[in-house]
A protein has these predicted regions:
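Phosphodiester-processing cores and adjacent nucleic acid-binding clamps
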Residues: 1-206
Length: 206
């Protein structure tokens, strides 16, 4: 499938999703790479949500393309789920469970999900003043500059599942600072932390 108009000469997409981003992308990485080449671009960043499952597929297809003599650069990345502090998030989450359980007990209402707190994916992408901060999962796009960065990218993905997993894997400022070498970090989409703050009127808040 080609674009209706020619792309800018040096345009490179730095935020892309495939079928490995559940409910947010379609197709295999190879489909996207072929589309990029077909439309005159010679590089593309794969940044699936919270995982690197498609990166090996992209790498294999990129190698095949280069061996055929065509110029192409695969940029390896991930769109992380992000909270400012995993420690604070865990504390807030546990307190929310306690508060919810207490409210249910007080109302003498039996429910199969008693003691559990359910997150809604759409809620994390919308701007709601006064929303409980622990429910937010900001989005953060990170791409690797080099081999060191690629190693740190994989480490962050692993730590997101080990240290910050509840329904979705998360990282925080502390982890990002610890494994920042060789990485490019961008603000992602409207689900990004700075986009949210701009929309909520407190963009300068640290």
């Amino acid at each position: 499938m080609s674009l209706l108009i020619p792309p800018p000469t040096r345009f490179v997409g730095l935020h892309g999703h495939t079928g490995f981003s559940v409910f947010d992308g379609l197709g295999y990485p190879s489909d996207h790479i072929d589309f990029v080449l077909e439309n005159g671009m010679d590089a593309w960043a794969l940044t699936d949500h919270g995982n690197g499952s498609g990166l090996a597929h992209a790498h294999k297809h990129a190698e095949k393309i280069r061996k055929s003599g065509r110029k192409y650069r695969q940029i390896y990345g991930c769109e992380f789920y992000f909270v400012p502090s995993l420690t604070q998030w865990k504390d807030d989450y546990e307190q929310a469970k306690i508060d919810r359980a207490a409210a249910k007990a007080k109302a003498l209402k039996e429910d199969t999900d008693a003691g559990h707190v359910v997150e809604n994916e759409e809620e994390t992408k919308t701007i709601q003043i006064g929303k409980d901060e622990w429910k937010r999962r900001y989005h953060l796009v990170i791409t690797a500059q080099n081999r060191v960065g690629l190693g740190n990218l994989f480490t962050l993905i692993k730590r997101a599942y080990m240290d910050g997993f509840y329904r979705y894997p998360r990282i925080d400022w502390k982890l990002l600072k610890q494994y920042s070498e060789g990485l490019n970090v961008s603000t992602a989409c409207l689900g990004g932390i700075y986009s949210n703050r701009i929309m909520r009127g407190n963009a300068l808040k640290k």
